[in-house]
Amino acid sequence: FIGIIIPNLYLHYYSEMLTQLLSSYSDYHYKFLVFSSEHGAEEEQQYIEELLSYQIEGLIVLSHTLSSKQLSSYQIPIVAIEREAEHISSVTTDNYMGALQATTLLIRDKCDILIHINVNVEKAVPAYDRIRAFKETCEEYQVPYDIDLSVIGNSYQEILNEIRRIFTRIEEKYPNQKKGIFLANDTYANMFLNLIFQKYRELPSFYEIIGFDNSPIASEAILPITTVGQQIDIIAQTAMELLVQQMEEQKKRSPKPLEKPVHKQITPILIRRNTTS
């Protein structure tokens, strides 16, 4: 068995990543035990104890609840995906490059104000580089920008309410300007796009929207959304390769554990669709 711990399934990125990880069964023939961890460290530790009681051989972690130092103490092969991973092996997207591509496109499309919408990401988390790249690129090109890190919520509806509040603020604050909106993920981007359609019945020329992930919702939206494509299939495949290598090593008579964690970074691809010029 391999254990998987994900934060939730309402963000389309996580559900797509889970789909890709589960599809690796045909290559490796490992069965999976999956927990969704939304309620803090105590719950997650309980899940890990339960997974260990099933004698899992390895663990893939996407949630941010426990530190990599705590996770490394369990003494089993672990790979993190898109989270803080100082003490364990990991696979991440080059978040800086992805956000740089998105921000540059909005600048090239002559938006008057660039706005980034996200949660308040900790600096140790790889996705913080999306915020950093957005800010640094706007400053380099001397473009006015606004960073809103106020998104909070533990359900789709709670987050939608937050995005609605932010949309109202943007409408009031920047009424006569072309707005380039770069959102933390495709789920947020789809919510924002739907709010625009509810108000205007179309995507007006004074809005451009870019998401992040290229999860299925980006192409299924009312207008296909321009997005920074994380190569989710390659991330999942790389994570499985890293984990299985560690697990196979553990089975040897005298196993040699990794001297230090292995960190792999996957290049993102900007996918231009209908929400940018």
Annotate the PLM regions.
Residues 13-27, 98-101, 126-145, 191-195, ...:
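Short, solvent-exposed amphipathic alpha-helices that sit
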Residues 168-180, 184-277:
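Flexible loop/turn connectors
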Residues 91-116, 132-136, 158-168, 189, ...:
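Hydrophobic alpha-helical segments within soluble ligand-binding/sensing domains
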Residues 25-36, 135-160:
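Short beta-strand elements in bilobed, periplasmic/extracellular small-molecule ligand-binding domains
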Residues 102-149, 255-275:
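An alpha-beta-alpha
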Residues 8-11, 38-39, 119-125, 152-155:
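Short histidine/acidic/glycine/proline-rich micro-motifs that form metal-
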Residues 1-104, 172:
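Alpha-helical recognition/docking segments in bacterial nutrient-uptake
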